[in-house]
Regions:
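C-terminal all-alpha effector/ligand-binding and dimerization domain
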Residues: 2-9, 20, 128, 177-227
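Short linear motifs at protein or domain termini
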Residues: 1-114, 224-227
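Short, flexible helix/strand-to-coil boundary loops that buttress conserved ligand/catalytic motifs
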Residues: 80, 90, 98, 164, ...
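Short, flexible turn/loop "capping" segments at secondary-structure junctions
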Residues: 45, 78, 144, 188-190
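Mobile beta-alpha loop/short-helix "lid" or hinge segments that flank ligand
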Residues: 72-77, 167-170, 186
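A ubiquitous short alpha-helical element
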Residues: 90-94, 109-113, 132-135, 176-183
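A short secondary-structure junction motif
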Residues: 35, 39, 167-178, 219-222, ...
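Conserved amphipathic alpha-helical segments that form helical-bundle/coiled-coil interaction surfaces
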Residues: 115-176, 191-199, 207-218
Length: 227
């Protein structure tokens, strides 16, 4: 392998945050989840435990346990050769993910609105101000995740929230494709997020659900435009 090819390979690796020594299993899992949720992995990527351990700067054991959880949640596919595969892009899979997100996240939003407080709405606004101040071009994936889970965590649902989190781990690889799409610069980052907040202020459940549905559908439409 030439120096140029090694350099290219390093450039294409996902950016994973190094892991502190304490609580390695949970920290490795959370670091990998963040990478999935922010589009660091693309559909069809092939990974190994050793590669992930090297990126995280830890031993294989905590990475193996973190990966086992991600396989169970559908974010990774384990193979007999011990190679890990990120599920490939597939139109049917994408449609199922969209339908699941629309249904489950709508339910979680309903529960969150039933517990609505002024402080919660202020916290939602703060996630958008942080993103706006950062001056990102195109969608800010970390702040997008922060907004949605500030919204959903308020529901305090032990049943629904883990299901939504698992859906986002699977959806996150599509964000990788969206960020590379020629239309990404045309995406208005928070237009539907602000619409959700305004609906929350009014106590408008239907308006909030409609804005959330538009937000979810828009990202999938980039990858599979309507005929």
């Amino acid at each position: 392998m030439t120096k140029a090819s090694r350099a290219q390979g390093a450039a294409n690796r996902p950016r994973l945050a190094p892991v502190a020594p304490a609580s390695l299993r949970e920290t490795a899992y959370r670091s990998l989840c963040e990478a999935f949720n922010t589009g660091q992995f693309a559909p069809g990527d092939t990974l190994t435990l050793q590669m992930l351990a090297d990126q995280l700067g830890i031993s294989l054991t905590p990475v193996r346990e973190a990966v086992r959880r991600l396989v169970a949640e559908g974010a990774l596919i384990d193979t007999p050769s011990r190679t890990l595969i990120v599920p490939k892009f597939d139109r049917q899979r994408m449609e199922e993910l969209k339908s699941a997100r629309l249904a489950l996240e709508g339910l979680v939003l309903d529960r969150a609105m039933a517990r609505s407080t002024p402080e919660w709405i202020v916290a939602l606004e703060a996630t958008l101000r942080t993103s706006d101040a950062a001056g990102h071009k195109g969608p800010d994936l970390r702040q997008n995740h922060a907004f949605h889970f500030t919204l959903y965590n308020h529901a305090d649902s032990e049943v629904l929230l883990p299901m939504v989190q698992a859906l986002w781990l699977q959806y996150g690889t599509y964000l990788n494709l969206i960020m590379k799409h020629p239309q990404v610069g045309r995406i208005a980052d928070h237009i539907f997020h602000y619409a959700i907040i305004e609906a929350l202020r009014r106590g408008d459940r239907d308006g909030a659900r409609a804005a959330l549905a538009h937000d979810i559908e828009r990202s999938f439409r980039v990858l599979a435009p309507d005929p």
